[in-house]
């Protein structure tokens, strides 16, 4: 994604709309400056191992600090996607999502990977904003537990293997994540880092609250049943045979998760059960909002 927080107007004028301003925060000028530096130094040899240095901490902080600063100046309703750096955490305040006008999100892959994985996985984990340092990964989890970060997402982007198996500059950014996102969080639960209540709150309750989604995000009578049922005692090894994406690959290929997904329900319909996808898909519906 390209950051569009380049003008005060987009946030200033948001008060004339009932919608929340949502931003992917990377400063494009900083990224382009870094791209030029690495191109001059490495030429055709620039690789995914340089990605977090090109789309670096400063590019994220400059953009997110601008967005948050403008939101405070104009009392705007702002939600920042895909936080990736420890430095950005000071921009956000702890508290209940219902009491905030400035909220934030973290993605599951930024809670799992760090810069050491680039040497093995390369373009498979090339994504924007980039996966950064271990200190950033642990800071994101800490901020989540402190309620500075309100929502957990996947930023699922299932590019084909042929697209990703290209040179660094030609390979698209993004990775498939929705199949294993919950298992990443269950691994953190198994490590006593996060509790189940927090997982449910950040992946479901707070999403519905923040965006005022009608009749979703909770297990309640009259609500749509969008539910994942897990076996937290049944390990699961990712392989090409059990990857369900049409793109056919996952950066977690070969990884052993501590839990398994037994069943998923979409709008009250069983979409997946015990390794089998339902024949009569899709069950999707257009969501509605209470605004």
Predicted regions and their residues:
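Short, solvent-exposed beta-strand-terminating loops
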Residues: 23-37
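Active-site neighborhoods of metal-dependent hydrolases
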Residues: 77, 81-183, 187
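Divalent metal-dependent hydrolysis catalytic cores, especially in the metallo-beta-lactamase
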Residues: 18-22, 26, 67-83
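Alpha-helix-loop-beta-strand connector modules within alpha/beta enzyme cores
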Residues: 12-23, 180, 184
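His/Asp/Glu-enriched, well-ordered alpha-helical/loop segment
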Residues: 45-75, 124, 145-152, 157-232
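C-terminal cap of metal-dependent C-N hydrolases
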Residues: 167-170, 221-287
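Short, flexible, mixed-charge acidic loops at enzyme active sites
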Residues: 33-44, 115-121
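Single conserved hydrophobic/aromatic residue that forms the stacking wall/gate
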Residues: 1-6, 10-11
């Amino acid at each position: 994604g390209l950051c569009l927080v380049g003008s005060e107007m987009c946030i200033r004028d948001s008060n004339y709309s009932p919608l929340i301003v949502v931003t992917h925060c990377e400063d494009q000028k900083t990224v382009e400056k870094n791209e030029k530096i690495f191109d001059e130094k490495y030429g055709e040899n620039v690789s995914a191992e340089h990605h977090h240095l090109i789309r670096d901490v400063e590019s994220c902080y400059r953009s997110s600090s601008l967005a948050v600063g403008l939101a405070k100046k104009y009392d705007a309703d702002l939600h920042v996607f895909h936080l990736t750096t420890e430095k950005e955490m000071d921009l956000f305040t702890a508290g209940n999502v219902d009491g905030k006008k400035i909220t934030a999100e973290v993605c599951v892959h930024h809670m799992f990977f760090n810069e050491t994985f680039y040497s093995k996985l390369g373009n498979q984990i090339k994504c924007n904003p980039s996966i950064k340092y271990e200190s950033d990964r642990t800071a994101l989890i800490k901020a989540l537990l402190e309620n500075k970060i309100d929502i957990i997402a996947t930023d699922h982007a299932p590019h084909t293997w042929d697209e990703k198996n290209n040179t660094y500059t030609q390979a698209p950014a993004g990775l498939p994540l929705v199949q294993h996102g919950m298992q990443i969080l269950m691994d953190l639960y198994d490590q006593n880092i996060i509790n189940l209540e927090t997982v449910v709150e950040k992946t479901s309750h707070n999403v519905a609250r923040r965006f005022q989604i009608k009749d979703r995000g909770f297990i309640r009578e009259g609500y749509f049943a969008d539910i994942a049922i897990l076996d937290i005692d049944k390990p699961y090894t990712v392989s090409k045979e059990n990857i369900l994406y049409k793109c056919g690959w996952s950066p977690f290929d070969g990884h052993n998760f501590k839990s398994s997904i037994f069943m998923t329900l979409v709008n009250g319909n069983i979409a997946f059960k015990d390794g089998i996808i339902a024949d009569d898909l899709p069950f999707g519906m257009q969501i509605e909002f209470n605004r």
